[in-house]
């Protein structure tokens, strides 16, 4: 199964952290970027191919992708990233959306168990969706 990760945007709400670094390349755990975490969890879940749709900071994303060897990963460039949102990024990746696939935002953190649970029941539903809701909200 294929996973498509939408990582074309800059993540302006996280400025100044994302001024020159794409959001998916941030390393909140020190050594591991968000993108590396996502791909590792996808691999553990049985995903065998990952397409990362890039835009802002393409070279930084490409550098991370080139260092991954335990799963097939490639990039697809969205030249319209500065003019569009995730819908535009999906349009750029539309030819990748054949057969079963998982679509993930480039800043979505998840554990493999969540994806495995979703995939386990995927055959029963045409478009399974995993979502989470906070029990309470703070002032942000």
Per-range role (PLM):
Residues 1-54, 58-61:
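N-terminal glycine-rich phosphate-binding loop and ensuing alpha1 helix
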Residues 2, 48-50, 72, 100, ...:
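Residues at the starts of beta-strands that form the adenosine-phosphate
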Residues 5, 52, 103, 128-129:
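Structural beta-sheet core signal
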Residues 10, 107-108, 133:
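Active-site metal-binding loops of divalent metal-dependent hydrolases
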Residues 20, 45, 68-70, 98, ...:
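Short, well-ordered coil/turn elements that cap or connect secondary structure elements
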Residues 60-63, 67-101:
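Short phosphate-binding loop-to-helix
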Residues 99-109:
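Short beta-strand-to-loop acidic/aromatic patch adjacent to the donor-nucleotide binding site
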Residues 111-140:
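Conserved core of the sugar-phosphate nucleotidyltransferase
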């Amino acid at each position: 199964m294929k996973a498509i990760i939408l990582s074309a945007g800059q993540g302006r709400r996280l400025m100044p952290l994302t001024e020159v670094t794409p959001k998916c390349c941030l390393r909140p755990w020190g050594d591991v970027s968000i993108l590396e975490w996502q791909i590792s969890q996808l691999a553990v879940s049985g995903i065998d191919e990952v397409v990362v749709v890039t835009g802002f900071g393409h070279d930084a994303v490409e550098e991370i992708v080139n260092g991954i060897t335990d799963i097939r990963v490639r990039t697809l460039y969205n030249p319209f990233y500065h003019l569009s949102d995730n819908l535009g990024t999906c349009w750029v990746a539309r030819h990748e959306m054949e057969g079963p696939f998982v679509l993930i935002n480039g800043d979505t953190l998840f554990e493999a168990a969540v994806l495995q649970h979703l995939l386990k029941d995927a055959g029963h539903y045409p478009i399974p969706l995993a979502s989470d809701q906070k029990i309470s909200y703070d002032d942000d």
